[in-house]
């Protein structure tokens, strides 16, 4: 068994890689740029998490959502005895917490840091990272770079120019599950990774079943019947408005279906608590706006309703 597979088993509990993970990881470890386009559930996160633990220094991961960062940090910490191995740097932290994170990084305790793009643009963040030993840069949900993408974030377009100040020769891995050829070209151009290797696998998901139903006058009753026919199975229901989220979640609970709401109008502590309960199977259904879901790693979700 090679060193990578030993690390894989020790830190993630897997005996073998799947899909394109191994060549992607080897390419990154060898100091080459990578652009990774894999479907949801294709194992993108491991492509930077394992190299972060394998290489010297700290890996910087740019991630667009606080919920997504927290989910990934919790998963990495869950497989390691030392919680300081992974941290987040975003607006959810107090000044004292930020100083603790920086101390762990400076003392070499931390191997991977998830940073919000808005936090990255701050002068103090740039100054601190310029003095840190960085192994590589990972850009998760890289489609946020593109003005043509459905999740465009202006701060994502500044990542490359910021790292030109911090570490101009940094190795970059950009990852997405959703990018048209036009968006792919824009990502590559913006990050200046024209000489990198592109990894793309099939997006055919034979294990998924899609169904479109006409809405009846009894939509809520239909929902309750469907969920009850999938008793004790995890599911996500997406609504267009916060009001719909709250009303539907309340209705499900009245009908003895363990449900929690999630939307940007809720206090952050409540959002985090509801997400944790869903991930820990303390509720069956999360009712949410599109604020929830990008990158959430829950292997037993059995239905998604829009």
Model-derived regions, located:
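Accessory DNA-binding and partner-docking regions appended to nucleic-acid-acting proteins
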Residues: 1-4
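Helicase motor core with emphasis on the C-terminal RecA-like subdomain
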Residues: 6-11, 15-19, 23-35, 39-45, ...
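Conserved Rossmann-like nucleotide-cofactor binding loop
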Residues: 67
């Amino acid at each position: 068994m090679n060193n990578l597979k030993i690390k894989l088993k020790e830190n993630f509990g897997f005996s073998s890689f799947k899909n394109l993970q191994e060549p992607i990881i080897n390419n990154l470890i060898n100091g080459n740029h990578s652009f990774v386009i894999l479907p949801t559930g294709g194992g993108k996160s491991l492509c930077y998490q394992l190299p972060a633990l394998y290489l010297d220094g700290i890996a910087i991961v740019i991630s667009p959502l606080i919920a997504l960062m927290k989910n990934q940090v919790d998963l990495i910490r869950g497989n390691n005895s030392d919680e300081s191995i992974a941290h987040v740097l975003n607006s959810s932290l107090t000044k004292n917490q930020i100083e603790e994170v920086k101390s762990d990084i400076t003392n070499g305790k931390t191997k991977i840091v998830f940073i919000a793009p808005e936090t990255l643009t701050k002068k103090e963040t740039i100054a601190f990272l310029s003095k840190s030993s960085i192994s590589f840069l990972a850009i998760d949900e890289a489609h946020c770079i593109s003005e043509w993408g459905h999740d465009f974030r202006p701060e994502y377009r500044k990542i490359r120019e910021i790292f030109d100040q911090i570490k101009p020769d940094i190795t970059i891995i950009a990852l997405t599950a959703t990018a048209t050829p036009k968006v792919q070209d824009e990502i590559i151009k913006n990050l200046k990774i024209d000489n990198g290797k592109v990894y793309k696998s099939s997006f055919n998901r034979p294990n998924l079943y899609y169904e479109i139903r006409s809405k009846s006058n009894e939509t809520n009753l239909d929902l309750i019947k469907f969920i009850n026919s999938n008793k004790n199975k995890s599911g996500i229901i997406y609504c267009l408005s916060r009001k719909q989220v709250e009303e539907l979640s309340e209705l499900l609970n009245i009908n003895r279906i363990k449900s929690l709401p999630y939307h940007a109008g809720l206090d952050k502590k409540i959002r985090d608590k509801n997400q944790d309960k869903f991930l820990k199977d303390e509720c069956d259904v999360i009712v949410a706006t599109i604020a929830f879901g990008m990158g959430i790693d829950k292997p037993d979700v059995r239905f998604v309703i829009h």
